[in-house]
UniProtKB/Swiss-Prot annotation:
This is Nitrogen catabolic enzyme regulatory protein. GO terms for biological process: negative regulation of transcription by RNA polymerase II; nitrate assimilation; positive regulation of transcription by RNA polymerase II. Residues 1-17, 45-56, 100-114, 703-714, 828-861, 868-899, 1000-1023 have a biased composition (Low complexity). It comes from Neurospora crassa (strain ATCC 24698 / 74-OR23-1A / CBS 708.71 / DSM 1257 / FGSC 987). Major nitrogen regulatory protein. During conditions of nitrogen limitation it turns on the expression of genes for enzymes which are required for the use of a variety of secondary nitrogen sources, including nitrates, purines, amino acids, and proteins. The lineage of its organism: Eukaryota, Fungi, Dikarya, Ascomycota, Pezizomycotina. A zinc finger (GATA-type) spans 743-767. Transmembrane segments: none annotated. Residues 23-34 have a biased composition (Basic and acidic residues).
Length: 1036
């Protein structure tokens, strides 16, 4: 840059080219006194700073350049300060500039101290001239920093020292900008480089100053107003925490500004100061809060519109204790700290929150536009359900009850919610399986929109704890509670249930209506328990766990559902063995309606092994689920149903309970779920199952179509697979067709286990076993007369075959099998509470009529207490607990119920249902059932009872092969068979005890009977061979 000499002339018209924003119209500026002096220093400054303070006279080229440059720079840089903000201080008109200079000199006398001089020559200037020249230059050179630097305490030199590099770079480029391609831009860039550190320093200083002020402020601002101001400022500066739900939940419990330190933390203070500076807000004024905005911030998604819980802490006077006003709605909760907070995100789940449950469901249709928001739904059909509801609570209009509706159990997410929640028009389950809810039926069990009509209030998925379907039925209230609620609805459900039945043949498993989640664990059977549905679908039955259980996948849950303490260990394997067995829980739903243990046993009705019947179970147990698990489908279901109260029935976990079997029996309809009468009587689901070609046969129906997953799948097993197997027959017998499976011999539809004749036609368990055993078609007269009489004669007299100790795997399980659950099925189907007798193991020959049973030797002297070893005739295979179809593994001594009057193909299933014991027993039942082939009737009861292929089959098939040499060996085969079968076992719904049917047998014979049943194990005799083959094939 042409050296601009520091001559007075040069200084006369100093061009503050140094500052890119400066316009060099210095020729317009009037000369100032002392120009020469200032010029001396200034010229140097101009040169050194490349501000090109060039004398217009001497350096016209320079001046011209500077003119040009500054016009450009002024145009470009003048509008921008170091950080890009428009600089208004560089008005380079002569008047404006002079005024600016004067202003700078007058107001910013300390600029010289605060801002680094453009050149080191400044230090040599005289104080006065130098100050004037410096100020003049500085005003043009550093206008953007005048305001920020005005308050600075450090001198420019110090600042330069702090950031010498940026300043030096800027100086360098300012000097050489003329030689650079992008001169103005480079100068501006270097200026910015220098300015940044200055700004940073300025912020730091201001922060420090603010911090010091804030530290001293608390002592000074002792007045209430000062405190309020502070509190308000804090509130403003501190954005409300959107995640702070507690504030909104209960303001009383929230710490208020009073609890906060009045002195903001340094960070807070600096932030506040910055905010005030940015917003030009003054600390002197108490900010008036826009409460609406704050409230909007605090709006919490809610399932139901509710008064906001204002975070009073966010208000100016939040620190003041809130005065309780009687008129305040939320004061009640405030006054009563013990009361649960009425939070929108309370555990009460929005009934209509569309969640994963409503995947295929039309929540609106299902719920009839039910919304938690619309209490008007009281008038909706749910009202109808309440009308039928015996409880005033339900009649109150629970459907509109926000609490219930939103409660997790009623949430759309839960299969059972709608049923429980009156929110559904027809039934709490209207959404899931309401007549409207064909979608439910079609949709997967877990429909996202199950109970979430769009109309519902704010649905807060995040804030509202939604019980998960998977969790099961009792999310918040326990399945039973819901059931109780549903029970009242049952009448409504009946009407609804019919429609529902068409839509949802299955329970949670196959049932779109009900999420499978509910199916597994909850003793949803209690839903089935609500016999209120009797004629109609029991909402409980519909969406009950059992539904899930119905479905093969659910069956495992079902097993859990029926896990009765100790029984589970031996049955754990079995629990999943047959989904249908497990599904028996679903029977609970339908059975009450059906009153038929056979219906209860329907879960057994289908063979989980059948590909169409239980996908989950089939996958898990390709050969068929282990039959060890008490075929709750048969017995367990029955016992579940036996629980007269569907509410209670869901929980009846002990097979020993006189499950509803007797109740079911009293309602004896054709046992087959497919039985039209039953379907009418039973849940619509049951009917649906019957009608559905894919529905399992009677079993499904019995298990109340809801849970009849099989209804959705072909019941029949693969043509070649297990044709002889009871399970396959049962599942396949009528499953493939929409019509309920009917025994081609006795025409019963309720057998616990379906078998096939050589032609592949379905036979009930009794007929199938009889045919296999004797090679002759079972005489229909035998169905009730002969077998029944036998049961009465021997079974009735016998209190309980011995204690059916659940024989886990081995005779090793002695009479006192680890879980020797001596469950007294107090009443069998006969309702005669047989004396609960623990027959010494020796008394009862444990026979594993089924492979599964054999797996656990009779050692579960549960059957007879006789271990395989103890019974000479019983071998390990026959060791399976003889005590009943319950299950070879665990035979639980169950007081034999008086023989039921329902012998015959269905009788077996009934008797199976009749006696229910813990899972153990169930298993034992299975094994016993397998083991209990003593007679066709017995087989029917026990074999049906046991749905596990081996056990179930064993019950039926093995039964036929009683080992004369077994405990019953002394008895003639016929006697054994009659004993095993008679013992009131047949009449009794198939007791889980299975051969425990032996329960019905005379005391002496009970063990023997058990033994006989067990003795009819593999090798039990020639008949055993056929029977064994039968049960073996069935257990495949």
């Amino acid at each position: 840059m042409a050296a601009s000499t520091t001559t007075p002339t040069a200084t006369t018209r100093p061009f503050f080219t140094m500052n890119p924003t400066t316009t060099e119209h210095d020729f317009r500026f009037p000369r100032r006194p002392g120009d020469s002096m200032a010029g001396t220093g200034l010229g140097g400054a101009a040169m050194s700073s490349s501000s090109a303070n060039n004398n217009h006279n001497q350096h016209h080229p320079m001046s011209a350049f500077n003119h040009h440059h500054h016009h450009n720079a002024a145009g470009s840089a003048r509008g921008r300060d170091s950080d890009g903000r428009p600089s208004s201080s560089n008005n380079n008109t002569s008047n404006g500039f002079v005024a600016n200079i004067n202003h700078q000199s007058s107001s910013n006398n300390n600029i010289s101290k605060n801002i680094p001089p453009p050149t080191s020559d400044y230090h040599t200037q005289s104080a006065s001239n130098g100050a004037a020249a410096y100020d003049l230059l500085r005003s043009s050179a550093f206008p953007p920093f005048q305001d920020g630097l005005a308050g600075m305490t450090q001198s420019p030199d110090e600042m330069q020292k702090q950031d010498p590099l940026a300043t030096q770079v800027w100086k360098y480029f300012a000097k050489t900008k003329l030689a650079l391609p992008n001169q103005e831009r480079m100068e501006n860039l270097t200026w910015r480089m220098m300015a940044k550190p200055l700004q940073t320093y300025r912020r730091q200083m201001e922060t420090d100053r603010t911090h010091r002020f804030s530290e001293s402020a608390p002592q000074k601002s002792t007045s209430g107003i000062a405190r309020l101001r502070k509190s308000s400022e804090q509130t403003q500066s501190q954005g409300s925490d959107l995640m702070n739900l507690d504030d909104f939940i209960n303001g009383e419990n929230i710490s208020t500004p009073a609890g906060l330190s009045l002195a903001p933390s340094p960070e807070t203070s600096s932030k506040m100061a910055d905010d005030r500076t940015a917003h030009h807000s003054t600390a002197s004024a108490i900010p008036i809060k826009a409460r609406k905005d704050q409230q909007s911030q605090h709006m919490i998604p809610q399932s139901v519109p509710a008064a906001l819980h204002h975070p009073r802490m966010q208000t100016e006077f939040g620190y003041l204790p809130r005065h309780l006003r009687k008129t305040s709605i939320d004061e009640t909760s405030k006054r009563n700290p013990n009361r649960k907070r009425p939070a929108d995100f309370s555990p009460h789940v929005s009934a209509v929150t569309p969640s994963y449950v409503t995947n295929g469901l039309d929540a609106d249709t299902d719920l009839h536009d039910y919304s938690l928001d619309h209490t008007s739904h009281d008038g909706l059909p749910p009202q109808t359900a309440p009308s039928s509801v015996p409880y005033a609570l339900d009649t109150v209009g629970l459907d509109a009850d926000t609490f219930i509706t939103s409660a997790g159990p009623f949430q759309q997410n839960f299969s059972f919610s709608p049923s429980t929640s009156p929110m559904v028009s027809h039934d709490p389950f209207t959404a899931m399986f309401g007549p409207n809810n064909s979608s439910m039926h079609s949709g997967p069990i877990n429909g996202n929109n199950f109970y979430s009509p769009p109309a519902s209030a704010f649905q807060s998925t995040a804030s509202t704890p939604h019980p998960m379907n998977e969790g099961g039925d009792n999310f918040y209230f326990g399945v039973d509670m819901r059931r109780a609620r549903q029970q009242p609805y049952q009448p409504g459900n009946h009407g609804m249930g019919n429609a529902m039945a068409h839509q949802f043949p299955y329970a949670g498993n196959g049932n779109m209506m009900f999420p499978a989640s509910s199916a597994g664990q909850d003793p949803t059977p209690s839903f089935a328990a609500p016999n209120s549905f009797s004629g109609h679908i029991d909402p409980t039955q519909v969406f009950h766990n059992e539904q899930a259980v119905r479905s093969p996948g659910m069956s495992v849950l079902q097993d859990s559902l029926f896990t009765f303490g100790a029984e589970s260990d031996g049955d754990e394997e079995d629990g999943g063995a047959f989904a249908d067995r497990n599904l028996s829980i679903s029977h609970d739903f339908s059975s009450q309606g059906m009153e038929e243990p056979a219906f209860d046993s329907p879960s057994m009705g289908w063979d989980p092994s059948l590909p169409g019947n239980f996908s989950t179970q089939a996958a898990r147990y390709p050969g068929g689920p282990p039959r060890k698990q008490v075929t709750i489908g048969a017995t367990t279901t029955d016992y579940v149903d036996n629980t007269g109260e569907w509410d209670g029935s869901g929980l009846p976990r002990s097979q020993s309970q006189s499950f509803r079997q007797s109740d079911l029996r009293k309602g004896k309809m054709s046992r087959t779920a497919s039985t039209p009468g039953l379907s009418a009587r039973m849940n619509p689901f049951e009917r649906l199952a019957q009608s559905a070609s894919h529905s399992p046969p009677a079993d499904v129906g019995r298990s109340s179509g809801l849970s009849s997953v099989p209804a959705s799948r072909p019941s029949s097993p693969p043509p070649g697979a297990k044709q002889g197997s009871t399970t396959n027959l049962q599942g396949a017998a009528g499953n493939s067709t929409d019509t309920p499976t009917t025994c081609t011999n006795c025409f019963t539809q309720t057998t616990p286990l379906w078998r096939r004749n050589p032609d592949g036609q379905p036979l009930c368990n009794a007929c199938g076993l009889f045919l296999k055993l004797h090679g002759v078609v079972r005489p229909l007269s035998l169905k009730t007369d002969v077998i029944k009489k036998r049961n009465r004669g021997s079974g009735a007299s016998l209190p309980v075959g011995g204690t059916s100790t659940r024989s886990k795997k081995n005779a090793s399980m002695s009479a006192a099998a680890r879980k020797n659950s001596t469950l007294s099925i107090t009443s069998n189907a006969n309702n005669q509470p047989p004396a609960q007798v623990a027959t010494p193991p020796a008394q009862q020959q444990v026979r594993a009529s089924s492979v599964n049973e054999s797996e656990s030797p009779a050692s579960g002297p549960a059957s007879g207490g006789n271990t395989a070893g103890s019974t000479p005739t019983s071998y390990h295979g026959s060791t399976g607990s003889t005590s009943g179809a319950v299950g070879g593994k665990s035979v639980i001594p169950i007081a034999s119920a008086p023989p039921k009057s329902a012998p015959g193909p269905g009788a077996g299933s009934m008797s199976r249902r009749d006696t229910i014991s813990s899972k153990r027993q169930r298993r034992h039942s299975k094994s016993a059932g397998s083991d209990q082939p003593v007679s066709a009737g017995a087989v029917s009861s026990s074999g049906m009872d046991v749905d596990s292929p081996a056990n179930s089959t064993g019950s039926n098939e093995t039964m036929p092969t009683f080992n004369p040499g077994g405990a019953f060996s002394g008895l003639p085969p016929t006697t054994q068979s009659s004993l095993g079968f008679g013992n009131g076992y047949i009449n009794t719904p198939r007791p889980m005890v299975g051969p425990g049917g032996m329960m019905g047998m005379p005391n002496g014979q009970a063990g023997q009977m058990m033994g006989a049943s067990s003795s009819s194990g593999p090798g039990s005799g020639p008949s055993r061979t056929g029977a064994e083959w039968e049960w073996l094939t069935m257990s495949l």
